């Protein structure tokens, strides 16, 4: 299965060796060598980097580690192709505009019957590639699009969270459906199941989180603001597997989080 990574923080920071740590899960005999992507939010827009080469051999990965933009919200992805050819159209994270903001989505799992599922309707959004992940993103966006909102504004947090949870519940019935979804304001996280490397079984946990309160910076993040801002920094990292020896917390199957600027602001348990 694919590898997921996300960072949410109060003040702009750089992922530094988080990129290398994520790429380490795509080297050697790993199956995850079918492409990678990184998204760095800059306000309502996003700087998106994707490639179809293995992350551990692509020269762009260490370049981004040293020169990538500082941000308060970032998503990362390494692909193991279960559906669709190895090409850019099938490589996440996927990005679309909605409500005047770039929306970004990355998924870990295999939704085998998604395209044939009658309740699934992606509406006016259509995937560019052939993956289940891109189709899942389109149907989520179509549901978000229908929520009440003022022109150019986001729907309420509760409405968005409820919709993310409803879509996650529908996807889980079709297969493992862990995903990261960001709308420039909030990072939504759904933890499901994944194939465990030691047992080969598809079980939880599929995601881990690392919470670093004010004044404690994680090893994989470098603060890019003043020393005063660094003392008030607050960071949450999400990853498919623990990337350091720090106190990563396994997420429960069916757990949905809404995270803003390094703080969990809402939760749902499916």
Question: Where would I find each of the regions flagged by the language model?
Answer:
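Extreme N-terminus nucleophile/cap motif
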Residues: 1-58, 254-258, 263-269
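Short acidic (Asp/Glu) patches
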Residues: 52-64, 78-101, 117-123
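Catalytic core of PPM/PP2C metal-dependent serine/threonine phosphatase domains
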Residues: 73, 150-193
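Glycine-rich phosphate/ribose-binding loops and adjacent secondary-structure elements
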Residues: 111, 182, 254
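Glycine-rich phosphate-binding loop plus the immediately following alpha-helix
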Residues: 114-115, 124-147
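Helix-loop elements that line ligand-binding/catalytic pockets
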Residues: 185-216
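A conserved acidic, glycine/proline-rich C-terminal tail/linker
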Residues: 205-255
């Amino acid at each position: 299965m694919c590898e997921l990574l996300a960072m949410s923080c109060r003040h702009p920071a750089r992922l530094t060796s988080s990129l290398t740590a994520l790429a380490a899960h795509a080297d050697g005999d790993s199956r995850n060598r079918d492409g990678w992507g990184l998204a760095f939010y800059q306000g309502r827009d996003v700087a998106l980097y994707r490639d179809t080469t293995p992350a551990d051999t692509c020269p762009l990965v260490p370049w981004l580690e040293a020169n990538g933009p500082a941000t308060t919200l970032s998503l990362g992805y390494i692909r193991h192709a279960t559906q669709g050819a190895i090409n850019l159209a099938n490589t996440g994270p996927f990005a679309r505009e909605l409500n005047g903001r770039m929306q970004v989505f990355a998924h870990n799992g295999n939704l085998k019957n998604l395209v044939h599922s009658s309740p699934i309707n992606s509406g006016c959004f259509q995937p560019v590639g052939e993956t289940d992940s891109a189709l899942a993103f389109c149907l989520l966006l179509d549901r978000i699009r229908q929520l009440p909102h003022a022109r150019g504004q986001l729907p309420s947090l509760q409405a968005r969270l409820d919709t993310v949870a409803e879509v996650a519940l529908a996807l889980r019935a079709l297969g493992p459906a862990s995903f990261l979804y960001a709308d420039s304001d909030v990072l939504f996280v759904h933890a499901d199941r994944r194939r465990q490397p030691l047992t080969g079984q598809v079980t939880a946990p599929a995601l881990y989180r690392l919470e670093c309160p004010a004044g404690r910076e994680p090893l994989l993040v470098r603060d890019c603001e003043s020393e005063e801002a660094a003392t008030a920094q607050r960071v949450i990292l999400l990853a498919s597997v623990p990337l350091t020896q720090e106190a990563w917390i396994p997420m429960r199957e069916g757990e949905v989080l809404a995270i803003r600027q390094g703080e969990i602001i809402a939760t749902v348990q499916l």
